[in-house]
């Protein structure tokens, strides 16, 4: 099975496309979500929400270093539920676009060890850079 984050089986070569074109594409989708805001609301990602989730990813990275990956893995998987809470399918106060929830779900689903988490954190950092570079606010 091909690794999601790496171009080799030893997980030493991070896929460049994740940090370049894919990161830029994700950032653009977060700024201009697929559906317009309105009744079926799909808001653009705010910098506050981006910082909230990115801050959580960085905090988990620190916890992994202190306590080990296996102990923190359930908290990593819980990022999906936090995204779901911020992106209800019906009613409620939708704080993040569907595209951002899909991004987090996809990333978290592919995290199986410490190396994968590091790759995810680096990929997220690239997305943050492109988000601001593409005019996110």
Language-model-detected regions and their locations in the chain:
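Small/polar/charged residue-enriched interaction surfaces, especially the RNA/DNA-contacting tracks
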Residues: 1-137
């Amino acid at each position: 099975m091909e690794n999601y984050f790496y171009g080799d089986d030893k997980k030493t070569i991070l896929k460049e496309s994740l940090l370049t074109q894919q990161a830029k594409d994700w950032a653009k989708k977060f700024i201009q979500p697929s559906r317009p805001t309105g009744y079926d609301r799909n808001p653009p990602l705010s910098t506050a929400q981006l910082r909230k989730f990115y801050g959580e990813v960085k905090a988990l990275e620190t916890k992994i270093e202190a306590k080990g990956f296996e102990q923190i893995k359930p908290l990593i998987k819980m990022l999906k539920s936090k995204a779901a809470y911020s992106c209800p399918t019906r009613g409620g106060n939708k704080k993040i676009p569907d595209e951002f929830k899909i991004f987090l779900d996809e990333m978290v689903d592919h995290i199986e060890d410490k190396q994968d988490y590091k790759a995810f954190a680096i990929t997220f950092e690239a997305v943050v850079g492109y988000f601001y570079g593409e005019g996110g606010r």
